[in-house]
């Protein structure tokens, strides 16, 4: 004999003919003859059973009537070299039996089959099975499949078999695949209706209440399975006192704006949460040193340089809802670069920068309202500057740091309101080219240049400004110093990515741990190589239903948007 497969085939022939068989597995009225030695070699259960005096050495029968005959027969065939023939119908029975008999290779084969064939049609069934038999590998995979396909599953016949504990787990998960929080109450109501179970406060707590539309909150109030429970109505009556909720991962899109390494084009990238990668969704011809602002899910890019040596006054935009570029936007009042960009609920602002005529710094702030035919003057900064940090907080425009006359950095912090400019606590160090973000009621800045004289030192500093106490706090430094990085806030976390470090484009990203006050390199948000990220914006998905009047069948109307 040349190999073990030939040997096992011979031994299986002995079994089929009854030669040397010394054990018979009895299941109800069925018998399976086998060899103790072969079973013990493949099954930990049989190994212990036959070697530790659990049965008399002369005993010829083992009764396993509590197991499924066909599954035991298939597994003993498997031990004797016959491949398992797995299907969606039999794999659960075979896996449960293999787990009881402790046949490791069969367990692995069954698990791999389930993982390979998991889909929206069977994920609930496999999740319930895995939860019952405590199979964490399948439970985790099937649960993630449920999260990914939840809006398909609310009309699945197996949806009603999910327990309240499972629904709490599903509705609480950040990765629930809904693009608008209004769909979470729809999922809850569909489950309540399918089970005819009354709502509980524990289920309502899973919803991100502060993100729900008034129409959906009214729908919860009026639904009989909710309104009939006093505790639920009491909870809904007090939602004004709940903490602000953070969006789920799929309810926003992370959109980055930068310069790609492909002929240095402007590149619009979108973060794929499922693959943990950035994917380019659009690009256009080269431009750099432009300002970025986002209003109504449209990304505006103002000024900068194009392929000519001159600064530009052009404004272009990318509509994230239609995935299209917009070119018919009024030009800036004059060409400029290295300016700041901001937006409030109505206007786009272009702040400071370098003018084209003589490369002089400008202090002007211009604003434009979409649909208007021109930009208008809004205000002037106290001194001309470029490459400063800008932020919009509590209706005020904050301008911090930047490069001023003499190519030096400044540490000034000022805010602009209808009453004019107000000075605030200066930065701890003179800075420029840093990134800024408003998060949790504070202004955060990171990276850039810091130097009191010549602008040449790349910074890894991270600072936060509290407008209530008018004070700066120094946080843990970045692992990698960088200028012009992107700083963004998503899901109650801070991220920084891209920029230039030691004159080289860096594709690294870092995540801030507030409790530990430390930054860690983030492998999940690594950028495309040689990609300069100018800005990263969380874009909230919008739906036509947001402007729809409430009706008694609003949830049915909401359901019609699934898949759109």
Swiss-Prot record:
Its main location: host cell. Signal peptide: none annotated. Gene3D superfamilies: 1.25.40.420, Kelch-type beta propeller (2.120.10.80), Potassium Channel Kv1.1, Chain A (3.30.710.10). Kelch repeats lie at residues 252-297, 298-346, 347-395, 397-441, 442-492, 494-539. The keyword Phosphoprotein does not apply. It is found in: Host cytoplasm. Transmembrane segments: none annotated. Residues 21-88 form the BTB domain. SUPFAM superfamilies: Kelch motif, POZ domain. The keyword Repeat applies. One of its GO terms (biological process) is symbiont-mediated suppression of host NF-kappaB cascade. It comes from the Viruses. One of its GO terms (molecular function) is ubiquitin-like ligase-substrate adaptor activity. Keywords: Early protein, Host cytoplasm, Host-virus interaction, Kelch repeat, Modulation of host E3 ubiquitin ligases by virus, Modulation of host ubiquitin pathway by virus, Repeat, Ubl conjugation pathway. SMART domains: BACK, BTB, Kelch. GO terms for cellular component: host cell cytoplasm. The BTB domain is responsible for the interaction with CUL3 while the Kelch repeat domains supposely serve to recruit the cellular substrates. Belongs to the poxviruses A55 protein family. Probable substrate-specific adapter of CUL3-containing E3 ubiquitin-protein ligases which mediate the ubiquitination and subsequent proteasomal degradation of host target proteins. Interacts (via BTB domain) with host CUL3. This is Kelch repeat and BTB domain-containing protein A55. It comes from Vaccinia virus (strain Western Reserve). The lineage of its organism: Viruses, Varidnaviria, Bamfordvirae, Nucleocytoviricota, Pokkesviricetes. The gene is KBTB1.
């Amino acid at each position: 004999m040349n190999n073990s497969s030939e040997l096992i085939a011979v031994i299986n022939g002995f079994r089929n003919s009854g030669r040397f068989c010394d054990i018979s597995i009895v299941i109800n009225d069925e018998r399976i003859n086998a060899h103790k030695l072969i079973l013990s070699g493949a099954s930990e259960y049989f190994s212990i059973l036959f070697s530790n005096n659990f049965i008399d050495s002369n005993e010829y029968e083992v009764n396993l009537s509590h197991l499924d005959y066909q599954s035991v027969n298939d597994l003993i065939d498997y031990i004797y070299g016959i491949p398992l023939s797995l299907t969606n119908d039999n794999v659960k029975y075979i896996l449960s039996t293999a787990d009881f008999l402790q046949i490791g290779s069969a367990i692995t084969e069954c698990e791999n089959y389930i993982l390979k064939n998991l889909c929206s049609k069977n994920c609930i069934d496999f999740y319930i099975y895995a939860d019952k038999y405590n199979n964490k590998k399948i439970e985790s995979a099937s649960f993630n499949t449920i999260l990914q396909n939840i809006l398909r599953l609310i009309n699945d016949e197996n949806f009603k078999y999910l327990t309240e504990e499972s629904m709490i787990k599903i509705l609480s998960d950040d990765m629930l695949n809904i693009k608008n929080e209004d769909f979470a109450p729809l999922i809850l109501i569909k489950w309540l209706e399918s089970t005819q179970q009354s709502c509980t406060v524990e289920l309502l707590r899973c919803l991100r209440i502060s993100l729900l539309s008034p129409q959906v909150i009214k729908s919860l109030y009026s639904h009989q399975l909710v309104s009939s429970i006093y505790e639920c109505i009491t909870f809904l009556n007090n939602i004004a006192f709940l903490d602000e909720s953070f969006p789920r991962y799929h309810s926003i899109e992370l959109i980055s704006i930068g310069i790609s390494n492909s002929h240095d084009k402007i590149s619009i990238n979108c973060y794929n949460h499922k693959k943990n990668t950035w994917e380019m969704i659009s690009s256009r011809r080269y431009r750099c040193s432009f300002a970025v602002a986002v209003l109504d899910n449209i990304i505006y890019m103002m000024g900068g340089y194009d392929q000519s040596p001159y600064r530009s006054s052009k404004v272009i935009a990318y509509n994230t809802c239609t995935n299209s570029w917009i070119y018919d936007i009024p030009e800036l009042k004059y060409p400029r670069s290295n300016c700041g960009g901001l937006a409030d609920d109505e206007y786009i602002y272009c702040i400071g920068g370098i003018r084209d005529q003589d490369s002089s710094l400008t202090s002007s702030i211009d604003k434009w309202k979409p649909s208007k035919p021109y930009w208008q003057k809004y205000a002037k900064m106290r001194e001309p500057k470029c490459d400063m940090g800008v932020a919009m907080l509590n209706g005020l425009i904050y301008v911090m740091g930047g490069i001023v006359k003499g190519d030096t950095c400044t540490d000034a912090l000022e805010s602009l309101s209808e009453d004019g400019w107000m000075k605030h606590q200066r930065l701890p160090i003179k800075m420029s080219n840093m990134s800024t973000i408003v998060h949790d009621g504070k202004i955060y800045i990171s990276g850039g240049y810091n130097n009191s004289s010549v602008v040449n030192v790349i910074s890894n500093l991270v600072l936060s400004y509290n407008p209530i106490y008018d004070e700066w706090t120094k946080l843990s430094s970045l692992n990698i110093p960088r200028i012009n990085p992107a700083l963004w806030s998503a899901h109650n976390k801070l991220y920084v990515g891209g920029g230039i470090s030691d004159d080289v484009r860096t594709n690294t990203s870092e995540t801030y741990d507030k409790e530990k006050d430390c930054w860690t390199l983030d492998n999940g948000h690594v950028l495309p190589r040689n990609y300069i990220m100018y800005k990263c914006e969380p874009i909230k998905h919008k739906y036509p239903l947001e402007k729809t009047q409430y009706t008694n069948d609003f949830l049915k109307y909401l359901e019609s948007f699934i898949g759109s």
